[in-house]
From Swiss-Prot:
Keyword Magnesium listed: yes
Organism encoding this protein: Mycobacterium sp. (strain KMS)
Keywords assigned by UniProt, alphabetized: Acyltransferase, Cell shape, Cell wall biogenesis/degradation, Cytoplasm, Magnesium, Metal-binding, Multifunctional enzyme, Nucleotidyltransferase, Peptidoglycan synthesis, Repeat, Transferase
Annotated region described as Linker, given as residue ranges: 244-264
Pyrophosphorylase: annotated segments: 1-243
Name of the protein: Bifunctional protein GlmU
Cofactor binding summary note: Binds 1 Mg(2+) ion per subunit.
Catalytic site positions: 376
Record's function text: Catalyzes the last two sequential reactions in the de novo biosynthetic pathway for UDP-N-acetylglucosamine (UDP-GlcNAc). The C-terminal domain catalyzes the transfer of acetyl group from acetyl coenzyme A to glucosamine-1-phosphate (GlcN-1-P) to produce N-acetylglucosamine-1-phosphate (GlcNAc-1-P), which is converted into UDP-GlcNAc by the transfer of uridine 5-monophosphate (from uridine 5-triphosphate), a reaction catalyzed by the N-terminal domain.
Localization: Cytoplasm
Reported cofactor(s): Mg(2+)
Chain sites annotated for binding Mg(2+): 118, 241
NCBIfam families referenced in this protein's UniProt entry, alphabetically: glmU, PRK14352.1
Length: 497
């Protein structure tokens, strides 16, 4: 990154986010569509915040009632003020920039950077390079070269390679449309020169709009300096206009995220099937297996084994844990714990160190202590389980009575038999046991054995009498006959001896 000669305290940034985004064909405002776990607007504002400008303004127009709360939330998240300017009528990018300038203090005399809310991969290094190139020029524009320039404004240069103007796609001649160097839509301006040029913009073009790009030609006519900074990596300045482009940039962002984790010491077995959001952290020597999605603010420690076919959203995984074929959200998995396969961790789950949640276990709002095992086929909801306990297969924590959710408390070193039902609210004391098939409706004292099932009673011949002719009845009759023959044979042998 080139060091900037412009202090961030002399810089204001305008983020243009007023457009309707009709090509998205969506009821969601375009800049609120997400990739990598952030909205496009969030990507833009996170990048700008790293440059630390003195002033930051977001220009809103279409759907501003829905976007403004997102801006407010991002201001809180970033810990800095963000002003909002309103473009009541969408009269073009030049008009949007004018609306943004109106939100700046009248005595501000520094550099104004104008960028867009739909350029999600733009990074702080590129913005810093723009400012370093700009110096004392009237304008500096980021450009890039693309294979297919359709839809972009073309960069026109003199024989001496000086930028003379930017011509939009709709207004370009056939020869101009063949130019592959395009406007990236990110600029640095001297604020005095920009204000003067904006007052002279005209809408006599194909779209009848006030183009911000037209200020470049005005600067040149006034004899002012115009500079360009070429961005070799065109993805950094690519915009999103439809869902195809959103998916393409999402895949490119994911590729970069996965590569960064690999270079930091994480093994990703199949990068093509692995999705990692931008705010996810992963420790060294962790293995990420195919089909894994790590979303939101998930935190994975070192030496973990995650996947295959696992989705974790806002989950913290301790060092050395194993998580296999699991879907989890807003949960905590302790160090050295094992989860899966086919485990569902709902919000509020906290599994202690060296604990286990096995096959076909579902948990919700439950704290499970260190070393405790819930091996298989169990629902644990609204519960607190102590350390080093074992919950038998097919157990159910009956937490809902039709009106309210109630909690179950299980102590430490408890052993529960298979198919135990805990009807909340109920407490099982430390060291207690429950028999298989027990329904726990009352508290169990520490060290007690709880058994609720009565004595088993066998009704002989019930199937033959009640289901005559059925396959079960025929099988029972055959088995009874064979048993009778065996008994007779045994009797004859006894008589013969």
């Amino acid at each position: 990154m080139t060091s900037s000669t412009t202090s961030s305290t002399d810089t204001a940034v305008l983020v243009l986010a007023a457009g309707a985004g009709t090509r998205m064909r969506s009821d969601i405002p375009k800049v609120l569509h997400t990739l990598g776990g952030r909205s496009m607007l969030a990507h833009a504002l996170h990048t700008v915040a790293k440059v630390a400008p003195q002033h930051l303004v977001v220009v809103l127009g279409h759907d501003r009632e829905r976007i403004a709360p997102a801006v407010e939330a991002l201001a809180t998240d970033l810990g800095r003020p963000i002003d909002v300017a309103i473009q009541d009528q969408q009269l073009g990018t030049g008009h949007a920039a004018e609306c943004g300038l109106a939100a700046l203090p009248e005595d501000f005399t520094g550099v104004v950077v104008v960028t867009a809310g739909d350029v999600p991969l733009l990074d702080a290094d590129t913005m810093a390079d723009l400012l370093a190139t700009h110096g004392s020029a009237a304008a500096t524009v980021l450009t890039t070269t693309v294979d297919d320039p359709t839809g972009y404004g073309r960069i026109l240069r003199t024989q001496d390679n000086e930028v003379t103007s930017i011509v939009e796609q709709a207004d370009a001649s056939p020869s101009q449309r063949a130019i592959r160097e395009v406007n990236a839509g990110v600029y640095a301006f001297d604020i005095t020169a920009l204000r003067s040029a904006l007052r002279r913009l005209r809408s006599d073009n194909a779209q009848h709009e006030l183009y911000l790009t037209d200020v470049i030609a005005i600067f040149r006519q006034d004899g002012l300096s115009v500079r360009a900074r070429h961005v070799d990596d065109s993805a950094l300045v690519a915009g999103v206009n439809d869902r195809v482009q959103l998916a393409a940039l999402g895949a490119e962002l994911n590729r970069r995220i996965v590569t960064a984790h690999q270079r930091a010491g994480v093994t990703v077995i199949d990068p093509g099937s692995t999705w990692i959001d931008v705010d996810v952290t992963i420790g060294r020597d962790t293995v990420i297996r195919p089909g894994t999605q790590l979303l939101g603010r998930t935190r994975v420690g070192g030496r973990c084994d995650v996947g295959p076919d696992t989705t974790l959203s806002d989950v913290t995984v301790g060092d050395g844990a194993s998580v296999v074929r699991t879907h989890g959200s807003e949960s905590l998995i302790g160090a050295g714990a094992t989860v899966g396969p086919f485990t569902y961790l709902r919000p509020g789950t906290a599994l202690g160190a060296e604990g286990k949640l096995g096959a076909f276990v579902e948990t919700k709002n439950a704290t499970i202590g260190a070393g405790t095992k819930v091996p298989h086929l169990t629902y644990v909801g609204d519960a607190d389980i102590g350390e080093h306990s074992n919950i038998g297969a097919s157990s159910v924590f009956v937490n809902y009575d039709g009106e309210t959710k109630n909690r179950t408390t299980i102590g430490s070193h408890v052993r529960t038999g298979s198919d135990t039902m805990f009807v909340a609210p109920v407490t099982v004391g430390d060291g207690a046991y429950t028999g298989a098939g027990t329904v726990i409706r009352r508290n169990v004292p520490p060290g007690a054995l709880a058994v609720s099932a009565g004595s088993q009673r066998n009704i002989e011949g019930w199937v033959v009498r009640k289901r005559p002719g059925s396959a079960a009845a025929r099988a029972a009759e055959r088995a009874s006959g064979e048993a009778a023959e065996q008994a007779l044979g045994h009797h004859d042998d006894s008589q013969g001896s």
